[in-house]
Amino acid sequence: MHAVVRNIMLADASVAALLGQNIHWSDAPANSPYPLAVLQKVSERRSYTLEGDDGLGRHLVQIDLYASEHRGMRQASQAVCKLWSGLRSAGVAGAFVQNIRETVERDTGADGLLYRVSLDVLIIIKETSDE
């Protein structure tokens, strides 16, 4: 699931134009340039039929987008929301943006602030036996 999610974000032209390779699971490396994305798996839910596991992994992923300017944070947020809103692909049965939160933190940015938007995205992955 981790590789699938990151690769989808890296392959999207709008997201890649804003974030480049700055998409990381759990934590960003020290001194990473802004804007950047940090992904966290919040939860995973399985569903079953009378015949067993339905083969779909329902992953709630928090995507935190950080930027040194408010405009950069909004641009990244819009691109990532557009990507995940209703996405269906070969490995993804569906993706849905559920919550969006904006915060501001103290940092060494141009105005002394670090802008963050947190997106909660439900990503339903088609599980295979080789994952």
Regions found by a protein language model. Give the residues of each.
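Oligomerization/assembly interface segments of phage tail-like spikes and tubes
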Residues: G55-E69, M73, V80, Y115-K126
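Acidic-leaning, charged glycine-interspersed low-complexity segments
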Residues: K82-E131
